[in-house]
Amino acid sequence: WHCRYAVEQGAASVVSVDLSERMLAEARAMTDSPAIQYLRMPIEAIDFPADSFDVAISSLAFHYIESFGGLCAKVNRCLSAGGHFVFSVEHPVFTAQGSQEWHCDAQGNHLHWPVDSYFSEGVRKAGFLGEEVMKYHKTLTAYVNGLLQNGFELLELVEPQPEPGLLEAYPEIMRDELRRPMMLLVSARKR
């Protein structure tokens, strides 16, 4: 989606990196744009020439990698001067407790979201689409300092809440999304 959107907004060329061949195949099936190049590799392995890109975008991927600071250094190198780095991750409050499940009473009502071992960064195992996946919990400090210590200035940090229309349309599902942040959106610029 992001690749197609970038081309629609006037990007001359777009490079997409993903480890999953299935995700790449689905992306390729949605467009035949010659402006989009799809590469299968771990995101940590990117090694593009310096000043190759004006913008780097990532959606919900960095909580699957161990070294955010190391990745920031690589992204900074391949961005042109003043280039933008925009990404989303699962919020550190959401990833702190590996189970990523609400604590409930005997009737199944959500009591609270568990936040434990927040400052203990590292591997967490969570269920995702019926499978156990490995994620790397990082603190908010780790994300912000990973940027600042690798040549970026922070432009905006957003903890999104459900839109009012979603709250009205799906009150049973969405009301709990106001009780804890699930996502973190970040916009930074290369210094």
List the predicted regions and their residue ranges.
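Short alpha-helix
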Residues: 122-123, 134-158
